[in-house]
Amino acid sequence: MNLSAMPDFPKGTPAFVEMLKKHEPFIQHWDLSRPSAPDELSLLPGGISLEPAFPDPEKLLDTAYADFRRFLSEAELSGGKIPVKVKETAGFPEEAYRLTIEKECIVLESSDTEGIRRGLYYLRDLIAASPFLKQGVHDRKPWLKNRISRCFFGPIKRPPFNIDELMNDIDYYPEEYLSRLAHEGINGLWLTMYFRDLPSSIFPGRGKDAEKRLAKLRLTVERCARYGIRIYVFLSEPKLFGSSHFAVPMEDAKDHPELVGASIADGRFGTFCTSTETGSLSFP
């Protein structure tokens, strides 16, 4: 492939990012031609009100509460007499929760913030389907602990464009986009970094723009945490020594030749020797 013939990557923020920032309002499609059954809790005509009593000093649930209240407003159910009691109960596994729909109230309980978040999303989906909720107990827990995805337009810092998402001003994680990911069950996102971009006592020339990278990384971590999403840094390290774009230049090891291990690919590359003391110290 002739990479020189490829067009340049578009500059600036893609236009579709503005679409990602927009909220998609709830539109009712309820079947109101029937009355509620005796074993159902009807949310009509009075509506429901959220009563959060779960301890959350870091305010990680603020986004989930705001999202739920906005949904109630769009569904014309806010400020009603039926309470949704959100409380802490010990003994649940991580992210597990119990949603109890009673005759006159709804109780959501969990042992951690993410269980409450998942429970609110589940309750929202139940109400979106019908304002008549069948009374009973819903005990739920995730069957997959780490549900990791990736920003669909986030660069991976590889040829031909080599764009580093931590070095530009593009917002890859708008609030509404994160809200949608969280609703779909995503609790992790990954992004790419390289050791050569981080400060190193073994390679003093590295990490020139580390402060800028780490500042945006911290901002991303903090924003995603508000939606129950962790950030995973992908590091395919240590690199080989050689002349390819994916390798560490051989001259970088001129002061530490012990870092160059076995020769491979007819001598074109040298492995990074982690068995030496210098090698073990080279990891950030």
Name each model feature, range by range.
Residues M1-G46:
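N-terminal pre-domain segments of enzymes
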Residues L50, R70-E95, L99-K103, V107:
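Short, well-ordered secondary-structure micro-motifs within conserved domains or adaptor modules
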Residues L20, P25-W30, P35, P55-P57, ...:
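Feature activates predominantly on carbohydrate-active enzymes
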Residues R34-E40, L72-L77, V86, F132-R140:
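Intrinsically disordered, low-complexity boundary segments flanking structured domains
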Residues A5, L43-P45, D62-T63, E74, ...:
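Generic detector of low-complexity/intrinsically disordered segments
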Residues L44-F54:
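Short glycine-rich, basic-tinged beta-strand/loop micro-motifs
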